[in-house]
Amino acid sequence: MYPANQSFLVLGLSRSGRAAAEFLLSKNAEVYLYDDMETERVEKELDRLSAQGGKRVDKEALAQMPEKCDVLVLSPGIPIDHPLAVAFRRNRRAVIGESELAARFIRCPIIAVTGTNGKTTTVSMLAEVLQKSGFQVQACGNIGTPLIEYCDMPTESFAVAEISSFQLETLNSLCPHIAVILNVTEDHLNRHYNMENYIFLKAKLLKNLTESEYAVLNYDDKTVRAFAEKTKAKIVYFSVRERIKGAYYENGNLYYLDEKILSVAELPSEGLHNVQNALAVIAAAKLVGVSSKDIAKALSSFKGIKHRIEKVATVDGVTYIDDSKGTNVDATIKAVETMKTDTVLLLGGKNKGYDYGTLFAALNVSKVKHAVLYGENRYALLKAARECSFDSVTLCDEFSFAVRIAAMRAEVGQTVLLSPASASFDQFASYEERGDKFAEIVATLAKEKEENREAAEPEEDTDETTDEGMDESIGEQLDERKDETAELFSNDGIFDSRTEETE
């Protein structure tokens, strides 16, 4: 591909769209720009890229682009069956994404990581292991910084790239030195329509691998294990269930080819899913040539990532955990499994096409004692809860209100867990924004409680605002919402009778 000889339409000016446009402009390509979000941020980006030589396209001119442009660069948030993408393909024009563009130009070897859950943690962990072992490395891709920004990295360095199913829709040229597939469970069915399509996309990461490359696969996941038949690459498995030729977990220790790397007690994050992530990292790091000592040292000091089972605060004996990155059922179940105390769970957001019955079946045998259902999909969650006889729930629409309800319901020694099993896009721009809002509300609650205590100290007879007063105010609002919801759902015990006055 010679960008200077071609014209491109960049559709969508998200992080990857902006990066793709900047790269193409730096190569003297003819670049057209369009984003249908008429926000201040988009306008600033259009102005900035136009100053570099980009050409703004208005909505009326879009229909001409499939004939005018050679290539459509599609942002990951825009599906491959978007009408404009369909029109480009009908005109025998290429439809690619930023990651595909990067794959055609990047010089350094890539370690690519995909899977339904654990991608960001694994990429961050692996990048840290390599960096602390003396390698020049960049964590990139879906984790935040677009892969295209590292096309000029020297050949002796590594790009550790998180690759999502959205990116795989338009990714055809990537041939990573090591491809890691962590797991495949139900996700993004509102985008990919069915599991067959989703599985096909995950397997695409392996399609260009030769006998010179490696595929690190989860032996315990039958779908992922079967991918071994779809590639020519050398296979290295990891497992938490069986002693295999690869990375495995046995009797509280993590091994690679029968050599102990470290004990599970040395891992800073709890949960079997984190053991799986660490095993995948061990396998990939060993293939690069990192010593067992360096791997163990880096893994034991890894601090984790934001919004993934992250402790926010403890307020009046209640612990608040941010797992806003838990955007699907499997991720939420894994987060719940790590809870050591009785838990109030915050669920809800934008539906991604899940069967929530699996979730509530798991909650019935977990530490979760109450669930606050909020957001766009709250009624779908409520329906699944009823069908699974999970009756201790509260229903509301707004996220901020839901967090306060959860705080009110939690008792000393319990945990409030935000792990929504849903996308954030009904009320937020991203799961990061949702998690930050959660932390902000918790901080506000802590401040309010402290102010109430201070106000109560000088005079015992003052007409003060207490925690109980705040609870009563919330309770009055809950009563109104309960009456509204009860009209839709008959009195079958869906509301917890223990808190009748506050719901």
Residue ranges, per PLM feature:
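Beta-strand->loop->alpha-helix junctions that form or flank phosphate-binding loops
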Residues: 59-60, 96-100, 232-249, 296-300, ...
